[in-house]
């Protein structure tokens, strides 16, 4: 995969291009090791400085980074024996949501998540990560299966929102989301949700009701996109950066408001810089959460989840 850069990463990109050029030019006759090390140190320092001061709009763009790992990438690096299950048994199989049985260090679990595409063909196939009602009904079918077999449920959230097309509305988009919210609140097995990219409105919430809700460091969670908010309040999407600041959509802000449980640290420069490192960090978080939830009885699990939901809106 070709490395892509956002505009605020361009100075870093220039240094990395120089490093690659020196590596290509270095051979037995010309030793450029010291110069490469100097530039590498400079690049690391610049990256640390840049990412230590990201504003909310920059974080929003990081959450959408084209090289960022998606659900299937995390499944590949965290779980074993993944067996994808398809279809809602009513209308179709929505490729914007993937899910199935897997093992987390040998333990059977149910994994469900939004899936975006990388190439144009994949983006169309995955509908840009925007599920239709059948996607949410597929997710619910898998959750009900997990409850029957007493399997923990792990969800990965990464969507700009539920698909707003006419067909989706005709097939009951709002009902599908609402039903998922209700049923997830009543599941008697542990549910762990993680925002890995964009957490867009009801489309995210439909697989986001859990006992633990985590966010990756450069992910976002909001009722609307910054561009959408700006278009409504200021009649111009160009005010997106201003909207992002006032929306409080970053992981750090949502942690302050007690709307999420923990923030999973990303590698220097973002999750796309090292799929292995971010997968290891997230896997550790999932295992710790599961160990904690395993100590609770069914009644304690449900009571704690209810209290969690009822606390929203109070600081």
Curated annotation (Swiss-Prot):
It is found in: Cytoplasm. One of its GO terms (molecular function) is acetyl-CoA carboxylase activity. Residues 38-292 form the CoA carboxyltransferase C-terminal domain. The keyword S-adenosyl-L-methionine does not apply. Keywords: ATP-binding, Cytoplasm, Fatty acid biosynthesis, Fatty acid metabolism, Lipid biosynthesis, Lipid metabolism, Nucleotide-binding, Transferase. It holds the Pfam family ACCA. It catalyses: N(6)-carboxybiotinyl-L-lysyl-[protein] + acetyl-CoA = N(6)-biotinyl-L-lysyl-[protein] + malonyl-CoA. Its main location: cytoplasm. Belongs to the AccA family. This is Acetyl-coenzyme A carboxylase carboxyl transferase subunit alpha. It comes from Haemophilus influenzae (strain ATCC 51907 / DSM 11121 / KW20 / Rd).
């Amino acid at each position: 995969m070709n490395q892509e850069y956002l505009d605020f990463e361009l100075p870093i990109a220039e240094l990395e291009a120089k490093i690659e050029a020196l590596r290509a030019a270095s051979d037995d006759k010309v030793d450029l090791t010291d110069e490469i090390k100097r530039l590498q140190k400079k690049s690391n320092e610049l990256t640390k400085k840049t990412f230590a001061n990201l504003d909310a709009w920059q974080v929003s763009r990081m959450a959408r980074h084209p090289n960022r790992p998606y659900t299937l990438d995390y499944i590949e690096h965290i779980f074993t024996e993944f067996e994808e299950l398809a279809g809602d048994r009513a209308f179709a199989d929505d490729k914007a949501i993937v899910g199935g049985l897997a093992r987390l260090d040998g333990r059977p679990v149910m994994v469900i998540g939004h899936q975006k595409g990388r190439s144009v063909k994949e983006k169309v196939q995955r509908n840009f990560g925007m599920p239709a009602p059948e996607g949410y009904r597929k997710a619910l079918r898998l959750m009900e299966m997990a409850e029957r077999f007493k399997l923990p449920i792990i969800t990965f959230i990464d969507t700009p929102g539920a698909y707003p097309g006419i067909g989706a509305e005709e097939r009951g988009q709002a009902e599908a989301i609402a039903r998922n919210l209700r049923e997830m609140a009543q599941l008697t097995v542990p549910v762990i949700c993680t925002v890995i990219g964009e957490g867009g409105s009801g489309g995210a919430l439909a697989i986001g009701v859990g006992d633990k809700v985590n966010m990756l460091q450069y992910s976002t969670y909001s009722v609307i996109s910054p561009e959408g908010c700006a278009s409504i309040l200021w009649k111009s999407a160009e005010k997106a950066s201003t909207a992002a600041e006032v929306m409080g959509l970053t992981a750090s802000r949502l942690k302050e408001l007690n709307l999420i449980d923990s923030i999973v640290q990303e590698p220097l420069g973002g999750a796309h810089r090292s799929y292995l490192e971010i997968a290891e960090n997230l896997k550790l978080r999932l295992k710790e959460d599961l160990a904690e939830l395993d100590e609770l009885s069914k009644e304690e699990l449900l009571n704690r989840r209810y209290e969690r939901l009822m606390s929203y809106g109070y600081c």
